[in-house]
């Protein structure tokens, strides 16, 4: 948000102009593309680790100043965590048949729709933590992959949806998505066999099964010519990306190419991940940091109280936020399933979890009151923008050790 950029630039200017200085150093970082793919923040991880090593820095706190929304004029909101985001991508492979004989094949759309109906808004894929609940999952895309019309059933179909999470791990979410998807296919296949029986059709098509993207890759790796295929596939993905193809489309295309290379004609569904991935993060759950989030909450509440304001602490910012890339709640190995399941080459979408773990800086969102965010009438409260928030940030810089030191 432009207000956040201007507000923090003003704080930087005022702090830098004071020759006496405060108790901590201030690094201003301006990055673009938040709420889409966070290219700026992901790209800045290398800079942050380089500066850390060059100047022996200890990052103690990161502050984003995105506006908050509230119906209470005397209330300020502090977010001490941010929701995580996964984007599962589902590619279904059917068995071709003529449209006039649908029970001699399996329509990939039938498989995809069965899974989509099962997963959409499923409560098992929401999450709860610290009294807050993440939104239910919702599909963004669902369609066949035919390039033109013909009279055959659909061989490939694909879709993707968003899963917003708080404490559940990517592995837990992937496992539950896998289980629910297989349940959906089992239910579909029972109905399908019953229809075949009614039509006097033989049961010659195998029961559809769900596999993970990682399993698909492992099966393909065992085949002759895989390395050459993989190199060509990655090059095509890079070229398509430069030509404007979305990450989600790249992931779908990559899975379809792997299925074609595998050559298994049985019906199946592949589940992987498409970018972007945002780890969930809450300052209460961070290890290996020198910062006490409770001290900040207390300090900010006391500051606001002297000005006649109340403080509302929200454990998670429920919109996508760059603070996801400031620290990890768990060890890097806990997130490996994401990297293994991303159906896009690292040259196209890079996420360096090791660097996030290296900077490991607690992050909060502390910004001005705003209204109609992301709309034409978007605006922020002038007093917050010019006085309340910047004045507190400056006080924090000058008295950080006195107020928030954990030693």
Please give the residue ranges for each predicted region.
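Hydrophobic residues positioned within well-ordered beta-strands of beta-sheet architectures
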Residues: 26-28, 88, 157-159, 269, ...
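An extended, acidic, His-containing surface patch that forms the Zn2+-binding/catalytic region
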Residues: 197-407
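Short glycine/serine- and small hydrophobic-enriched flexible loop segments
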Residues: 9-17, 114-121, 394-398
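Midchain, well-structured core segments that form catalytic/ion-binding scaffolds
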Residues: 53-253
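Flexible loop/turn segments at secondary-structure boundaries
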Residues: 35-39, 69-72, 98-99, 167-170, ...
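Acidic/histidine-rich catalytic neighborhood of metal-dependent amide-processing enzymes
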Residues: 1-81
């Amino acid at each position: 948000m432009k207000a956040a950029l201007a507000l923090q630039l003003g704080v930087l200017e005022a702090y830098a102009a004071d020759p006496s200085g405060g108790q901590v150093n201030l690094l201003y970082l301006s990055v673009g593309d938040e709420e889409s793919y966070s290219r700026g923040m992901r790209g800045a991880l290398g800079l942050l680790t380089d500066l850390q090593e060059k100047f022996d820095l200890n990052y103690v706190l990161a502050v984003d100043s995105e506006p908050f929304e509230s119906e209470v004029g005397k209330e300020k909101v502090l977010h001490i965590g941010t929701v995580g985001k996964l984007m599962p991508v589902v590619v279904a492979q059917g068995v071709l048949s003529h449209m006039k004989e649908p029970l001699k094949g399996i329509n990939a759309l039938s498989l995809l729709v069965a899974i989509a109906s099962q997963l959409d808004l499923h409560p098992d894929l929401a999450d709860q933590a610290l009294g807050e609940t993440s939104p239910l999952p919702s599909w963004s895309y669902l369609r066949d992959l035919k390039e033109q019309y013909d009279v055959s059933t659909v061989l490939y179909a694909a879709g993707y949806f968003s899963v917003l999470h708080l404490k559940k791990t990517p592995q837990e979410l992937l496992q539950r998505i896998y289980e629910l998807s297989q349940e959906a296919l089992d239910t579909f296949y029972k109905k399908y066999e019953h229809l075949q029986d009614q039509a006097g059709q033989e049961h010659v098509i195998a029961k559809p099964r769900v596999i993970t993207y990682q399993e698909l890759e492992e099966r393909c790796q065992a085949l002759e010519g895989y390395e050459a295929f993989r190199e060509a596939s990655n090059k095509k993905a890079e070229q398509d990306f430069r030509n404007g193809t979305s990450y989600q489309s790249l992931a779908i295309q990559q899975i379809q190419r792997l299925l074609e290379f595998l050559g298994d004609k049985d019906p199946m569904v592949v589940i992987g991940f498409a970018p972007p991935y945002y780890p969930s993060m809450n300052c209460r759950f961070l290890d290996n940091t020198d910062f006490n989030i409770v001290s900040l909450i207390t300090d900010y509440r006391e500051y606001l109280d002297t000005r006649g304001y109340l403080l509302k602490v929200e454990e998670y910012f429920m919109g996508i936020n760059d603070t996801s890339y400031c620290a990890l709640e768990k060890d890097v190995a806990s997130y490996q399933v994401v990297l293994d399941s991303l159906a896009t080459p690292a040259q196209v979408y890079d996420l360096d979890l090791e660097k996030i773990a290296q900077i490991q800086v607690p992050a909060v969102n502390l910004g001005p009151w705003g209204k109609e965010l992301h709309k034409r009438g978007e605006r922020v409260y002038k007093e917050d923008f010019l006085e309340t928030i910047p004045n507190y940030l400056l006080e924090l810089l000058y008295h950080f050790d006195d107020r928030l030191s954990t030693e």
